[in-house]
């Protein structure tokens, strides 16, 4: 059986999607499938390390200033060539698609022409996320129709969690869906006995865009420094909000305590997380985030690092109901509340034995490999039907 994965983002480009799709591809390979990945050429200077036994085909794509495939001109620079790459390649038994909606729509057209089923990794409802960056009714209306049309043609949606599936149903998208949850790649993220730092260090790892609202921790850090003068806040990742956050740090006079870094490979990030006082994660208080989950918490927990989350959505329930006393805390999207939680973590950092126990618990509960097995089980059932 031949499986083709269509995704604008894949290793060595650093993102949650890259790691997730790699585990899916490897699981398809282990089940005896012939796996091909159609993706984009990576950013300049990236070192390619493709998974064994999987063919990865890359094509040029338009990237933004941060070398990221973001925005609809960039998406179309991937989607239009993708249509021809799919049309004129050897026929597949299944397409696996990573959004944006335009990519899913392209795959629906080709899938119909080639009579090939497709499934979608549905981690977000893009139409609502777009409300953060445009108020144009025309653009939002077109996007909703394109997204609904693409998702409605799939044989299966692998949704991030049940609240997102429920949101699809409200929007009239009735495609069969399996909430698969989230996890971390436990081969990369682990705890190796690091002691908590002194002075305290807080890590934000991942994208910081408008709907993440990660600048809340810059404001909180201004208060934290009153109690812990040597504390640091470090951002690893990229996003549209970076310049605004840097300006905010300068305006508060704390620019030397707030540092920004490019994305780094998971294994390197794991070492940093394992040695941090806590990780911080946030989602802005907007309607679409009522069902969005801050997936970066899973990597943190796998590395034995507790989480401080600020914002709405399922992450709050996850942390408050986690079956582990050291998983972390959830607070409102408020700088004062975030600062209080950060000060508490700095005053009583989690010791190594408790960090080791947290990492062990997390790796047993939230493994990307286990999720990949479920995805492939469902996908192969579709092929065989």
Regions found by a protein language model. Give the residues of each.
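Carbohydrate-associated surface elements
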Residues: 41, 163, 182-183
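Acidic donor-binding loop of glycosyltransferase active sites
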Residues: 155, 273-290, 305
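N-terminal subdomain of nucleotide-sugar transferases
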Residues: 1-55, 224, 385
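Conserved donor-binding/catalytic core segment of Leloir-type glycosyltransferases
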Residues: 158, 195-221, 234
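Acidic anion/phosphate-binding donor-loop and adjacent secondary structure
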Residues: 169, 183-199, 213, 349
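Membrane-proximal helix-turn-helix segments that form the acceptor-binding/catalytic region
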Residues: 83-87, 105, 109-113, 122, ...
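Nucleotide-activated donor-binding/catalytic signature segment of Leloir-type glycosyltransferases, i.e.
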Residues: 243-270
């Amino acid at each position: 059986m031949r499986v083709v994965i269509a995704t604008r983002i894949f290793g060595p480009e650093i993102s949650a999607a890259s790691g997730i799709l790699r585990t899916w591809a490897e699981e398809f390979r282990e089940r005896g499938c012939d796996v091909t990945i159609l993706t984009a050429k990576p950013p300049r200077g990236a070192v390619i390390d493709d998974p064994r036994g999987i063919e990865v085909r890359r094509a040029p794509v338009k990237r933004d200033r941060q070398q990221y495939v973001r925005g609809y001109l960039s998406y179309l620079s991937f989607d239009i060539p993708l249509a021809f790459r799919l049309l004129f390649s050897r026929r597949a038994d299944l397409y696996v698609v990573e959004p944006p909606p335009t990519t899913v729509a392209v795959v629906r057209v080709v899938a119909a022409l080639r009579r090939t089923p497709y499934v979608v990794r549905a981690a977000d409802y893009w139409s609502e996320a777009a409300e953060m960056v445009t108020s144009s009714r025309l653009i939002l209306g077109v996007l909703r129709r394109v997204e609904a049309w693409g998702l409605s043609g799939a044989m299966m949606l692998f949704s991030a969690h049940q609240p997102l599936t429920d949101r699809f149903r409200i929007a009239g998208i009735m495609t069969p869906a399996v909430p698969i949850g989230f996890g971390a790649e436990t081969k990369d993220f682990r705890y190796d006995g690091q002691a908590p730092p002194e002075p305290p260090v807080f890590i934000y790892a991942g994208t910081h865009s408008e709907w993440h609202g990660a600048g809340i921790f810059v404001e909180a850090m201004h208060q934290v420094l009153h109690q812990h003068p040597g504390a640091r806040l470090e951002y690893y990742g990229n996003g549209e909000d970076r310049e605004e956050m840097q300006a905010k740090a300068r305006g508060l006079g704390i620019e030397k305590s707030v540092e920004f870094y490019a994305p780094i490979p998971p294994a390197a990030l794991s070492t940093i997380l394992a040695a941090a006082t806590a990780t911080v994660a946030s989602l802005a208080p907007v309607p679409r985030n009522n069902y969005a989950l801050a997936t970066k918490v899973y990597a943190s927990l796998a590395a034995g690092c507790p989480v401080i989350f600020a914002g709405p959505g399922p992450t709050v329930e996850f942390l408050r109901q986690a079956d582990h006393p050291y998983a972390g805390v959830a607070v409102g999207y408020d700088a004062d509340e975030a600062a209080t939680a950060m000060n508490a973590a700095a005053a009583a950092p989690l010791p190594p034995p408790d960090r080791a126990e947290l990492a062990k618990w997390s790796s047993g509960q939230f493994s990307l490999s286990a999720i990949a097995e479920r995805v492939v089980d469902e996908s192969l059932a579709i092929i065989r039907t």
